[in-house]
A protein has these predicted regions:
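Beta-rich globular "head" domains
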Residues: 107-121, 266-414, 422-431
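Localized edge beta-strand/strand-to-loop motifs within extracellular or lumenal beta-rich domains
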Residues: 190-206, 212
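Glycine-aromatic-enriched beta-strand/loop faces of beta-sandwich-type recognition domains
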Residues: 129-192, 367-380
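Secretory/extracellular carbohydrate-interaction modules
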Residues: 87-165, 302-305, 321-329, 335-344
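Ligand-recognition surfaces built from glycine- and aromatic
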Residues: 33-47, 226-293
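Extracellular glycan-recognition surfaces and repeat-rich motifs
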Residues: 61-82
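Extracellular "spike/adhesin" assembly and maturation modules
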Residues: 1-30
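C-terminal interaction-tip segments
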Residues: 125-148, 216-219, 404-405, 412-432
């Protein structure tokens, strides 16, 4: 057996020597560079799973994720055939429509924030200004066409006043998209476009902007700041999405901007690391559900009117039936209306106020985000992790134009008159 085993080994090594002899080795190094849009805003290779903070499309209706500011004859109209919203203005000077999300999206330091907007701008004409991007009234980044000229714009309020730094297409520092740039492409902003930007904030980083054409990211202009400026370039990178169209003066006929889809993505995931707060009914003062089948507010939350761009997320609810063997139903409702009671600040550094003494509640046009049943007992409260898989579903919302903070309410009803409950809610404030 030893001889046979030795023969096998000799045969194996002879074949190995033959294979190795056919290989050509080179000691020269081959430089490999992976950059450009293959990496995120912090230079990390784009291999991580993106976490979607927000997405918007319009399949069956103008969804409830946006609010409008309308001046003159402007309007927002759902277009069922095209699956989008038509934003229109007339020809009169001052006609304007602005569409903004009811939520502000959380930038997490050290994570690249990728934003995409799709749209079709209306025909270029004198005095007509059209915009789309990641911005609000005071800060942000957006693409603009005024008349027939395209711009990338950085809006900042770090000086105490709003300053719009516009960079005309001819001056874009990556690709002017006039046929002479690296891509060889010519931008037609009256055609369907996918605008993208990735944001490396940390107060001082770079914002890369461009378009996605033929399935490829085409960088157009970078707003660079590190080693160049003396302060932050915008007040915050936690911002809403916007579309807008304005007649700066009279125009020749009506105009239409088609709003299609939007998304905000945190590249590399997202971890909640905010301040944790809670509010609830006092142990000695349970909520009495006077009329069976009627929902009453147990705890209501809303943003302070002075902090409508704050980011606060409901994370858990706890509710306990005081009346043994009584049957209850609870709901978490966005944009309902609490009547009566007193709104109390959750703290000097908090952007939230709460109401635990409301006397009546109306769902109205609000949305029921979660619901459940429980029975009164002496076995402890029912705790519900309200986050589940949708991290920002229970984020507090607002209308920046009115301005109004929308409520988020834990409401409860019982099967019998006069049953009582105790309840509390937990939330996390990211912006602080």
């Amino acid at each position: 057996y030893h001889d046979q085993f030795a023969d096998v080994l000799r045969l194996y090594f002879n074949r190995l020597d033959n294979i190795l002899g056919q290989l050509v080795a080179s000691m020269e190094t081959i430089p490999v560079s992976i950059g450009g849009t293959n990496t995120d805003a912090f230079g990390r290779l784009r291999v991580s799973n993106p976490l979607t903070l927000f997405d918007s499309s319009h399949r069956y209706a103008d969804n409830t994720l946006w609010v409008n500011s309308i001046t003159g004859t402007a309007a927002a109209t759902f277009n069922a055939n095209e699956g989008l919203v038509d934003l229109t203005v007339g020809s009169a000077s001052g006609d304007q429509i602005i569409r903004e999300t009811i939520k502000v999206f959380s930038y997490q330091p050290g994570k690249s924030l990728l934003v995409m907007n799709t749209f079709i701008f209306g025909t270029a004409k004198a005095n007509l200004r059209q915009r789309a991007g990641y911005y609000g009234a005071a800060n942000g980044i957006y693409f603009e066409r005024e008349g027939s000229i395209n711009y990338m714009v950085e809006r900042s309020s770090v000086t105490g006043s709003v300053v719009n730094t516009r960079v005309a297409q001819a001056d874009w520092n990556q690709d002017p998209m006039d046929g002479t740039g690296p891509s060889g492409l010519t931008l037609d902003s009256s055609k369907a476009q996918i605008l993208y930007m990735d944001i490396e904030w940390l107060g001082l980083g770079t914002v890369r902007t461009g378009f996605i054409i033929n399935g490829a990211f085409v960088p157009c202009h970078n707003f660079n700041h590190a080693n160049l400026i003396n302060t932050t370039y915008i007040t915050t990178a936690s911002l809403p999405l916007r579309y807008e169209m304005t007649n700066a003066a009279a125009t020749t006929g009506a105009s239409t901007l088609k709003q299609v889809c939007s998304t905000v993505i945190s590249e590399g995931g997202y971890e909640l690391r905010g301040a944790q707060l809670s509010a609830g009914t006092p142990i000695t003062t349970p909520k009495t559900l006077t009329t069976a089948g009627t929902f009453y507010p147990v705890v209501s939350l809303r943003l302070k009117t002075t902090r409508l761009d704050a980011i606060a997320i409901l994370t858990a609810v706890s509710i306990l039936g005081i009346t043994n063997n009584a049957n209850y139903k609870w709901e978490v409702v966005a944009s309902g209306t609490t009547t009566g009671g007193t709104w109390v600040s959750a703290g000097t550094n908090s952007g939230v106020e709460y109401n635990i003494t409301g006397t009546a509640f109306t769902v109205g046009t609000g949305r029921i985000l979660a619901t459940g049943f429980f029975q009164g007992s002496n076995q402890g409260s029912n705790s519900v992790d309200i986050l589940k898989e949708a991290l920002f579903t229970t984020q507090l919302e607002r209308d920046p134009f009115t301005p109004t903070a929308y409520e988020l309410t834990l409401a409860c009803t019982a099967a019998s008159n006069g049953d009582q409950v105790l309840g509390s809610v937990d939330w996390e404030e990211i912006s602080r």
